[in-house]
Regions:
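Active-site-flanking alpha-helical
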Residues: 12, 59-60
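Catalytic-loop signature of eukaryotic-like protein kinases
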Residues: 53
């Protein structure tokens, strides 16, 4: 797990580098970019990269990479408009 400068990880967030599934065992490096924000209770799955300045809403499940400066929310996490 790599957490870059000034990233914020909320209370009770879970960052996984490995995952046991019924028929497979997944592993992967997780990178939390500079100034990224992970909300409370969010779950980041193995192999995901959260880009610099990205935001993950509380209680979201992140299964795919999040681009820099994007905001994602939900289960599974999807991009949301930050108007």
């Amino acid at each position: 797990i790599t957490v870059e400068d000034h990233a914020i990880i909320g209370y009770d967030a879970t960052i996984l580098c490995h995952e046991f599934l019924q028929d497979e065992y997944r592993t992967g490096e997780v990178v939390i970019g500079e100034r990224a924000m992970i909300g409370a209770g969010a779950v980041i799955l193995p192999g995901v990269e959260i880009g610099a300045g990205a935001q993950v809403a509380a209680n979201s499940l992140v299964a795919r990479d999040v681009p820099a400066d994007a905001t994602v929310a939900g289960v599974p996490a999807e991009p949301v408009d930050r108007r």
